[in-house]
Amino acid sequence: NQSKAKVDDLREHQRASYDIAESDKRLKCGKSAERGRIMAKKTRAERALKFETLQLHVGQEQPDPVTDARAVPIYQTSSYVFKNSEHAAARFNLSDAGNIYGRLTNPTEDVFEQRIAALEGGVAALAVASGAAAITYTFENLAQNGDHIVSAKNIYGGTYNLLAHTLPAYGITTTFVDPFNYEEVENAVKENTKAIFIETLGNPNSDVVDIEKIANIAHAHKIPLVIDNTFATPYLLRSFEHGADI
């Protein structure tokens, strides 16, 4: 019975993934509500699967239809073939969802992103070349000239330097706080604060921060809680389940 239940769960996940692929074209036409409904269905199906199953199958629920290969191939292409000029035009004006250029999308990266999102319990993911790039993308997306960030002071040195020295050159300032002093965290939030940032395990001391308490402060001010989960990984801790937003 347990084996049958696992098979049924995996099939449900496969059906949801197929529905998402079929709805990608309609998504570009404005039917995001349908995509959201299907994503919710897929997320529910993923939650029924164990962590080890997600590690192996998410993003490539069906083997390669041509070769029947189980493992995800490493696509090294930078370009893609279009059926004709109309097909290319549709891809580039985003009326037809699909691969355009390697700098934007890659089939291997797509599987990786889906798998990471599933393991973390998120709705989507973006693959980049390094953790530093991921954090930089995040802050540059949330804040701009004149904005402010609140960050735990017990964080990775590269991130500290980014916040303390690099981003100020772009007009983005940061207040560093003791993440265990919740009054200090609260008082550091300003009208122009765009996010609170912590690490699940502070680098290098492995401090264990109370994510839910920090999340409550962030959400009370209607700003996101950004978490670096490098040390813990989703195998040990899923930050979204404790209030993280990014």
Where in this protein do the model-derived segments appear?
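Conserved N-terminal alpha-helix of the aminotransferase class I/II PLP-enzyme fold
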Residues: 84-133, 158-165
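Conserved PLP-enzyme active-site core in the AAT-like
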Residues: 43-46, 63, 125-246
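Short conserved active-site loop signatures built around small residues
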Residues: 40-75
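Positively charged, low-complexity intrinsically disordered leader regions
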Residues: 67, 76-85
